C-alpha cells in the first residue's frame, strides 16, 4: 500500500492509505499420469482410477486402455499440492498391493 500525506479540513496533515490492486494469477496446474507396466492388472488400474480420481467405471476403463496402448494416461489435472498428494496415495497403495504401477505428475 502506498502512503501519502494529505491535508484535510479537520486536520492539518493526515495519512491516507491507498489500496494498490495486485494482479493475481491462477496457480500452476499439474497432470497426474499413470504409466504402463507389464505386471499391474488392468482391473487394479481401473480400481485406482475410481477410488482416487472419482472416475466412473466406463471412464476409468477408457483411461486404463489409454495407459495400456499409449504407455501413459492422464488421470486428472490439479494444483501442485493436490497432484502430489494423489501421486503419493496411488504409489503407496500400488506398492502395498505388490504392484509396480507408477504414478507421476507433470506441469500441464
Curated annotation (Swiss-Prot):
One of its GO terms (biological process) is protein catabolic process. Gene3D superfamilies: 3.30.1390.10. It holds the Pfam family ClpS. Belongs to the ClpS family. NCBIfam families: PRK00033.1-5. Involved in the modulation of the specificity of the ClpAP-mediated ATP-dependent protein degradation. Binds to the N-terminal domain of the chaperone ClpA. This is ATP-dependent Clp protease adapter protein ClpS. It comes from Ralstonia nicotianae (strain ATCC BAA-1114 / GMI1000). The gene is clpS.
Amino acid at each position: 500500500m502506498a502512503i501519502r500525506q494529505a491535508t484535510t479540513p479537520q486536520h492539518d496533515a493526515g495519512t491516507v492509505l491507498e489500496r494498490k490492486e495486485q494482479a493475481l494469477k491462477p496457480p500452476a496446474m499439474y497432470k497426474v499420469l499413470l504409466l504402463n507396466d507389464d505386471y499391474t492388472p488392468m482391473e487394479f488400474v481401473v480400481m485406482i482410477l475410481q477410488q482416487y480420481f472419482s472416475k466412473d467405471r466406463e471412464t476409468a476403463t477408457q483411461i486404463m486402455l489409454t495407459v495400456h496402448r499409449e504407455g501413459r494416461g492422464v488421470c486428472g489435472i490439479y494444483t501442485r499440492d493436490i497432484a502430489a498428494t494423489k501421486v503419493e496415495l496411488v504409489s503407496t497403495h500400488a506398492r502395498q498391493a505388490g504392484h509396480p504401477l507408477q504414478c507421476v505428475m507433470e506441469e500441464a
